Design a protein with these regions (language model features):
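Membrane-embedded alpha-helical signal segments
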Residues: 1-186
Length: 186
């Protein structure tokens, strides 16, 4: 049986997302609010503006108090949306929606004790299509290639193939060149 509804336990939620999206280009960071409530943000590397995400989302949320003396959550997602500067955000309640949004270039904010997720539109998608490289002219076959750095190329693939089955593994090869390469597969 596949679990699709989000738990109130942030650790269970994070483990579920890591298992469903095990590719190394799906990243996350954790932080706590002022009163110690754990939060986690998941995003696809190269598809999100990390600086804006940290400055305009994580920092303001970490300055909030989410609990009162009785341990109940006072601050709702609407309140969090007021304290962050991203106008594009929405609440979702299933893992399928979370995964679809993360693969689409949005960020997912999990909060311990909350059984829904705030999707934050902090997209920074690559702006060009995969095209023929100027120095590698093919006589036969497809005329598509990658000409940017490896992270941009990975995000171009992720932008085109929005599936949780896409995997990346990055490694260094070559004694002289010490070149970063990425192996991609479905």
């Amino acid at each position: 049986m596949v679990v699709n509804h989000i738990s109130k336990n942030i650790q269970k939620n994070c483990n579920y997302i890591k298992n469903r999206l095990p590719s190394e280009d799906i990243l996350h960071f954790t932080f706590n609010t002022l009163d110690g409530v754990a939060c986690a943000i998941f995003y696809a590397d190269g598809m999100v503006n990390k600086e804006l995400l940290g400055e305009l989302v994580a920092r303001p949320i970490s300055a909030l108090k989410l609990k009162n003396e009785g341990g109940m959550y006072e601050t709702t997602f609407e309140n969090i949306q007021k304290n962050t500067l991203f106008p594009e955000s929405k609440e979702v309640k299933t893992f399928d929606e979370v995964i679809r949004e993360v693969l689409d270039g949005n960020s997912a904010l999990f909060i311990d004790g909350v059984s829904s997720v705030l999707i934050i539109g902090a997209k920074l998608l690559p702006v060009r299509a995969v095209m023929e490289p100027p120095t590698d002219i093919a006589v036969k076959g497809p005329r598509e290639g990658f000409i940017e750095d490896i992270k941009t190329n990975m995000s171009l693939i992720r932008k085109r193939l929005k599936t949780p089955d896409l995997r990346f593994e990055t490694l260094r090869v070559g004694k002289q060149s010490d070149t970063m390469v990425s192996i991609c597969w479905l």
